[in-house]
Structure formats: C-alpha cells, structure tokens
Amino acid sequence: MSLLKERKPKKPHYIPRPPGKPFKYKCFQCPFTCNEKSHLFNHMKYGLCKNSITLVSEQDRVPKCSKPNSSDPKQTNQPDPVVKPTSSKPVPSGLSHLDAKLQHSLAKDDIKENLDLHARGPHRCLGQKPTPHKEAAPPSPAPEAAVGTQPVLEGAVRPSAFVPVGEHRLKGQELTETPEALALTHAPAKASSFHTKSAFHAPGYPWRAGSPFLTPEFPHKIPSTKGFGATSPYVHPSITEYPPHFYTEHGLATIYSPYLLAGNSPECDSPLLSVYGAQDQRHFLPHPGPIPKHLNPAPSTYDHYRFFQQYHSSLPIPYGFYRPESAFSSYGLRLPPVAGISRDQSSHLLEEAALGYQALSPSKLNSSNSHKKHTELEKQSPTPEAKEPSKDGQRDTEGTKMSPRAGSAATGSPGRPSPTNFTQTSQPCAGLCGLSDAPASSAPGRIPPPEQGLAAFKPIKKNTEHPHSQAPENRAVSPKSLEALSTDAPTQLGSLEAAPSSPEDGSRAAPLNLSTKPEAEPAATCSPAHGGFVEPQDAPLNLSVKDPCNALTSRPSVCSPPRGAEPAAAPTPSPTQQREPASSGDGPDPSSVEAPVPSPTGKAQDIRAADSDEQKQTAAVALCQLAAYSPGNVEPAAQEPTCRPDAPTPRAPESQEAQCDLRPKGQKRTSPREVGKGQQGSKKAKPSDTARVFTLRKRTRVS
C-alpha cells in the first residue's frame, strides 16, 4: 500500500489535496497555500519559490508525509508520536517506525523525497529530529526555530517546503520525517537517497556539501539519533576515503587537471574514481596514499588501463616517479608550455627563419646582384643588423604578439617564410624594423604610404618640370637616400617617402612650381625629409602598403621618383599617364616604377628590377641598389621620367592619391592591374608588382 501510494506521488510528483482540509499545505518561504502539495512543490521546484530544489526535496518529504497524512493523517500522526521517541531514542525504533511509515505511506512520500534530500536531508533530518520533538507542537514556530536551530536545515527546518497547516501534521510529518531520515541516513538508506537524489536533483554535490555538515552534525545529532551515530562513521569513512582517492586522483588531476581538480574531486571522486577504477585504486591508494601525487598518477594512469593496479604497491614507486615525471613533464608541463612555446618558438623560429631568409635573401640577392651587393649590403646589411636587433626585440614582441596572430590569417605569414618569403623577408626586416621603429605611427604610416607613393610620383612631378636639374638632386638624394638607407634603412624608407610626401604636398599645392629651385627644394626636401621625417613617417611608410623594401624602393623612387615616372614618362606622356596611373595605382610600387622605364636607364632598372623580381627581392631593394649602385642610371631615368611625368603629374597625383589611399584598402590588386596597363612597356614589372602587391598585402596584414 505504501509502495503503491509512494509510487503514485512519485509519478505525478504531487499529492492529492487532503480531503476536507482547505489549503492544507503552505509553501515554506512563500505565503502560497494549497491543498495540493504538487502546486507548491512545483512552485518551489521551478524556483518560483526562493527555496532551492534541494530544500524542496528535503521539505517535500514532509509534504509527502502530509500526503500520507492527508490519506491517513491520523495514522501518520500515530507513528509520529512513536517516531518522536524513536527518533530521539533508538535508530532501530526509527527503522521500525520507518517501516510503519512506509506502510503508512509517509515512508513512500518521505522516502521518495528523503532519497532526494538525504544529501542534506540526513543531517537535516537529524537536526529536525530534536527540532520536531521540540517544535512539533508549534507548526509555524517549528520551521523558524528549526531554521534557527540548524543553519544546515535551510530547507530542513521545515521538513517540507510546504508546511502542513495542522500542527499535528507538522509534528507527525516532521517526526515521521526524522525516522525516515534516520533510516535513510543509514548507509543503505543513504545510498538509495543518493541515487534517488541524484536522479531527482544533483544530490551528489549537495550530499558532499552535506557530508561535511553531516560530519559535524552527527556528533550533535548522534545522541538524538543513534542511527546517525552509525551513519556518521559511514559518512566519515566515505569522506575520508574520498580525500585519499581525491588526493591520489589529484595526482592524476595534475595530468588530467580538467577532469580531476580539487574543486571537482569531491563530486568526481565516486564517479570518476569508479571510472578510473578508483575502487581498486582505493585499496592500493591507501598504500601509496602518502605518495599519491607521485605514485598515484602512475597508478592512476595505469588504473585507467587497469594494468598496474595489481602492481600499484610495488611498481608504482619506480614507475610512479618515472611515469609521473614523464607524464607531468611531457603532458602536464611540456604540452601546455610546448604548445605555447611551440607557438612562440615556432613563430620565433619561423621569424628567425624568415630573418635567416631575410638576411640570406638580401645576401643571396646581394650575391646575385654583385654590383648591387655592396649597395644592398650597405642598405640591407645594416638594416638586418639594425633591424634584426629591433626585430629580435620585435620578434619577441611580435613572437609574443605574432604567436597568437600567427594562427590568424591577418598576421599569418609576417614572420614566417612564404613563397614570397623574400619579399616578406624584406618586409620583416625593414617592415618589422620600421614597425618597431614607429609602431605607434603605424596607423598614420598606412596613410602616409599612399602619400609616399604620391610623394614619389609628385617629386616626380617636381622632377617633371626640371628633370635634369632635379636629376642631380635625385642623384644626390638617391645616394643620400642610399646612404641614409644603409644608415637608417627603415627610417630612411619612411623619411624618403615621407619627404616626398611633404614635397608631394608642395608639388600638389604648386605642381607648376616645379621650377628647378622648387624642384631642388623637393629633392632637397626629399633628402632632408629623410633626415627630418625619417622616424615619424618611417614607421608609417614601413607600415604603408609597401614593404620596407618597397619603402626602400620608394626611397630610390623618391630619390629617383622618375622610376615611377620613368616607366610612365619614358614611353610617352600618354603611356606615362597610363603607366603613371598604373604606377600611381601601384603608388610607390617600385616594380612598376622599375620595369616600366623604357629609357635605357629605365631598361637597366627594369632589368635590375627583373633581377630583383626574379629573386623575389623587393623591387625596393633592387631600386635602392640601382640608385646607390648606379645613381647615374637612376638620374637619367629619373630625368626622363621626370620630364614626362609632367603631363601625367596632374593625373598621377590624383590617381596616386586615390589609388594610394585605396591601395591600403584594396587597390593593391588594382595596382598590379593598372601597373600592368602602365607596364605594357615592361611586363616584368608586373611580376614584381604582383609580388609587391602580395608583399604589400602581407605587410598590410602585418601592420
């Protein structure tokens, strides 16, 4: 009968309202009252009431007791008086009364809820045992007094969240609850309560939370309930056992920290340990228990495999120490550090490799361009020297920065070798160095680069009127820029380009003021700009779409802006316009600047540009080398393009401005196309432009 009734409330989770007694049940913390506990139960269960489901489950025992009470309220009450002495007196009596309760269907409801509540329920029931005896008479005081009496009895103060309106029910329910709680408190009852509770709500956690409470509460409540005295030893052993497993597994926790952490271990002990074969481990763990962190990880590790469990006591020491070390170092320590280090190191190593490629690529390029070698060595070598230290710093910084970024596409390849690694090599060398030089101005840098390209061509404009007059100046600038390049490659890059930017402004303001003196001024401005703008715009130029090498190219371009102008100017003003818009599309892109030059100087530069393109060296490097190695060539080329860019100059500045401005956005691709148009005369420039465009893209990503 009790079982049937017990199951009935379990299935519907509500008890039919007691007959003839309106609002028999009251929510523990709410003014809600109802004849059907299910309403209040759901009220609390779903958090409508402040009582937690745990409290609800604890307190539902009593409502279920009331439930039987409603069916047999007097019968329940009868067992309750018996239960009072029983609960206060012998656990066996509590058990017998518990059986009676089960028969009375108090047991059915109580057990159902008690199982849920036994995590806290057992000790709370304990607290309630004396409390019900004391407070059974006053139903309403009982809950409050019970709460005050036992803080642990948050919900247990009132056996149920739903307090029966009648005192007799309160007494009977609480008392009956207590015996049931006592009975359930027994190991078997607890086990069932844990299972039921875990099924009902996460009881395992509250149970452990309650377990500590049970432990202290048991001493208090043991006198009132001997059953708990018996249970307390049970609980204590379980708790004490778990810490050893806990610690033992804790050793594993180091390896399997996500699974077994001190915080998780209490709950994880039984489930995880059972999973890990903790039972076998329990037997062996007590032995290695003192060494759990060292030995147990190995046994634990093996426990998963159930391999050395037999040998835990004997083998675990050598294997335990050895295996845990390897496991911890390789897994616990190495993997996270290795992951991070491998990322950082891999990024560093890749960056170093890139540096090696960078250093090697300039060297290779230098060796390949023996005549350019000295110039490039002057420029690149100091740049790698100056840049590599800064890049070393940056490598660490970017290694740190890039290691996370390395995974991201944006910075994906900055420090790493790539098919265009040499271009990137120049980029990392000059670009990273330049970035390190003026990382703060990187944002401005991107904007200046368009100016850079504009500047390169606008100096070309200035050169345009007086190509010859400025040609020497370009010469001077180019050697200066080369020297400055070798001196401050990244800085000079920015400064040269920056200087053109200022001349560019001047040329824009007065493109007609390209008289020799103004031209000289722009040229001089270019060289002074190298010194003056070097650092400020250095970074912006480096950050510009151009590679630092492109910046170098711009520098030669600035030094001999004619290159950009050369390609455009040499063929014809209209081709110049085409090319210059193309090159302006390319902006400073030295590749278009290099290749397009149809003039013999332009051709020579084109050849050299082709060489640099072939070597995937940034055209900037080749241009710098060309400018430094044969400033005369640059000069004639500069002069020729300087003369012709005049016509394109107006368009070139505009297109350059627009395209250079756009280039950081998306004109890079357009630049190669336009460059292709303008570079019809020289197709090799296209490859360099394309490579440069890629380089620029990569640089943009880097920046």
UniProtKB/Swiss-Prot annotation:
Classification via InterPro entries: ZNF750, ZNF750_Znf
UniProt entry tagged with the keyword NAD: no
Skewed-composition ranges (Low complexity): 79-93, 583-592
Domain of life: Eukaryota
GO molecular function, one term: DNA-binding transcription activator activity, RNA polymerase II-specific
Zinc finger boundaries on the chain: CCHC-type: 25-51
Polar residues composition-biased segments: 67-78, 418-428
Keywords recorded for this protein, A-Z: Activator, Differentiation, Metal-binding, Nucleus, Transcription, Transcription regulation, Zinc, Zinc-finger
Subcellular location: Nucleus
Basic and acidic residues composition-biased segments: 375-399, 605-616
Region called Disordered, residue ranges: 60-96, 121-147, 362-617, 633-703
Residue positions binding Zn(2+): C27, C30, H43, C49
Keyword Cell membrane set for record: no
Biological process (GO), any one: epidermis development
Cellular component aspect of the GO annotation: nucleus
Annotated function: Transcription factor involved in epidermis differentiation. Required for terminal epidermal differentiation: acts downstream of p63/TP63 and activates expression of late epidermal differentiation genes. Specifically binds to the promoter of KLF4 and promotes its expression.
Listed name of the protein: Zinc finger protein 750
